[in-house]
Amino acid sequence: MLSTGIAHAMLVAVCALPFAAHATLGQNVSTIDGDQSRMRAVARFAMTQSAYSVHEMTMPSGTLVREYVAPNGIVFGVAWEGPTLPDLKSMLGVSFDQYVSATQTRRGTPLAVSSDGLVIYSGGHLRSFAGHAYLPPAVPAGVDVSVIQ
């Protein structure tokens, strides 16, 4: 198991990457178009459901990132799984500060943040990370949040 100092250093290093990797939670979907080139994604796929669409991208590391977009064009959820963490600062936007605060109080265990305005789950270990985040007020009517994974 990694020491908390090393884990915190890894989190800071990942979040300090020089490129924006993803559309931002709670923001307009328009930034997704440039994501593939910025994150050097090796594959991109979009799928439309009746109440939302999902944009999937695979990073060169093999990490899969999914962005869930409401019909109004707002990113209401993001999810990731793979050997490396994506750029969480870019993905979570203004919600990133809540994420960082929670990591300082929950070291060495999966992270769970749950409030009326934000839900984040992040866990894993070196070479195997997974998580998701969503904004409950932005989830389209009739969408089960369990699809955000």
Q: What are these regions, as identified by a protein language model?
A:
Residues 95-149:
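Helix-rich interaction surfaces within compact, conserved domain-sized segments
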Residues 1-10:
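Bacterial N-terminal signal peptides that target proteins for export
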Residues 9-16, 36-50, 105-110:
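Intrinsically disordered, low-complexity linkers and terminal tails enriched in Pro/Gly
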Residues 3-4, 60, 85-86:
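Intrinsically disordered, compositionally biased low-complexity regions
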Residues 69-106:
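Mature extracytoplasmic domains of secretory-pathway proteins
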Residues 4, 23-24:
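Long, hydrophobic N-terminal alpha-helical segment
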Residues 18-21:
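N-terminal signal peptide c-region/cleavage motif recognized by signal peptidases
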Residues 24-81:
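N-terminal secretory signal peptides
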